[in-house]
Amino acid sequence: MTPTKPKVYIVGVGMTKFCKPGSVPGWDYPDMVKEAVTTALDDCKMKYSDIQQATVGYLFGGTCCGQRALYEVGLTGIPIFNVNNACASGSSGLFLGKQIIESGNSDVVLCAGFERMAPGSLENLAAPIDDRALSVDKHISVMSETYGLEPAPMTAQMFGNAAKEHMEKYGSKREHYAKIAYKNHLHSVHNPKSQFTKEFSLDQVINARKIYDFMGLLECSPTSDGAAAAVLVSEKFLEKNPRLKAQAVEIVGLKLGTDEPSVFAENSNIKMIGFDMIQKLAKQLWAETKLTPNDVQVIELHDCFAPNELITYEAIGLCPVGQGHHIVDRNDNTYGGKWVINPSGGLISKGHPIGATGVAQAVELSNQLRGKCGKRQVPNCKVAMQHNIGIGGAGVVGLYRLGFPGAAQSKI
């Protein structure tokens, strides 16, 4: 019989406002991380000296940027792990932090993520160096053999071509993807941390400047500056600090995986963007936690481009394969429907500072479970789900709930 893993909780969260790159003069990544970490520590009324280990996710930057950033908060000699897993860097750091606590090596781990990006499209995610292999060259080969390559941002082509494949195989329409972007921009109106807080009409989404094929600017996540942080603790720590039980969010399950052989073997753009990886992880997550999609009320999902949200509905088990567009038709992805998906505005509207994204999802879900989201609060929020991916590839799916709902209720 497999021994039960120790429980891990999030007790403090914080994030900066996500901003257009360079829009805040003099705002460098150490400043961003300091703001997010300080907010997270204030949230749980802890000190940096309480932190025993830390993970910091980022994509663009040199070695030891995590140290450089956290040194602005304190120098305590703790182990600091820098995590680079493409767009899943932040959630990969959460996965590592959870494992550290489960191992018994630490009771308090800080997980942060940040990005300071250049303006423009998500063009050079793999930071290519001319004299060596590109981390996504095999993924690009799949795309070149199916739809070819065009002079457009590579990531937009990847997800745009996945949408074209879905349209051809399953009958989704251009409007389904526009409706997802419209919905996420509408959600972000009530998120003060969001990069965009403006409502756009469906016509504005459809008629926006085209980035690739049918896909317009408002269906693509922007480049962003920002940071997010979460404080993870063990159950043993909570027993010694019961004041934190009322706000403790249990990480019920968190799965990290990489690409399956089908990514390169089947010449499918849907599989190339990580469908099988996420589907496998989600099945494992549901089985291990003994929860189902019907138990979930809110989901933060990696909508780097609108097509990925629709396709992921199928991968995580919200509906059968090929029926993601029916969720859009039924409005089962927003308030009043079966799930509220991306109440924060998602990557499309909240912003996508790559290393911060996965941690920011956990921040939003923790605040939703704690009932702290104001006008965007999801009613009767009991179980929350996270989905974060990085092409190259890495995928993370997770489930969260209040660890001690009785304690939370007694505090109200």
Swiss-Prot record:
UniProt motif Microbody targeting signal: location: 410-412
Superkingdom in the source lineage: Eukaryota
Phenotype on disruption: In short-term culture, loss of the capacity to enter the dauer stage which is associated with a loss in the production of the dauer pheromone. In long-term culture, the capacity to induce the dauer stage is restored and is associated with the accumulation of long fatty acid chain ascarosides. Intestinal expression of daf-22 restores the production of the pheromone. Partial dauer phenotype in only half of mutants when the dauer pheromone is added exogenously.
Keyword Transferase: yes
Compartments reported by the entry: Peroxisome
Keywords: Lipid transport, Lipid-binding, Peroxisome, Transferase, Transport
A GO biological process held by the record: positive regulation of developmental growth
Pfam families hit by this protein: Thiolase_C_1, Thiolase_N
GO cellular component annotations of the record: peroxisome
GO molecular function: acyltransferase activity; lipid binding; propanoyl-CoA C-acyltransferase activity
Major site of localization recorded for this protein: other
Enzyme Commission identifier(s): 2.3.1.176
Tissue expression remark: Expressed in intestine, hypodermis and body-wall muscle.
Gene3D superfamilies, per database record: 3.40.47.10
Family recorded in the similarity comment: Belongs to the thiolase-like superfamily. Thiolase family.
PANTHER family with a match to the protein in the record: ACETYL-COA C-ACETYLTRANSFERASE, NON-SPECIFIC LIPID-TRANSFER PROTEIN-LIKE 2
Chain's role: Catalyzes the thiolytic cleavage of 3-ketoacyl-CoA with 8-16 carbon residues in the acyl group using a ping-pong mechanism whereby binding to 3-ketooctanoyl-CoA results in the release of acetyl-CoA and the subsequent addition of CoA produces 3-ketohexanohyl-CoA. Involved in the biosynthesis of the dauer pheromone by providing short chains of fatty acid that are attached to the ascarylose sugars of the pheromone.
NCBIfam families tied to this protein: PRK08256.1 (NF006102)
Protein name: Non-specific lipid-transfer protein-like 2
Organism: Caenorhabditis elegans
Taxonomic lineage: Eukaryota, Metazoa, Ecdysozoa, Nematoda, Chromadorea
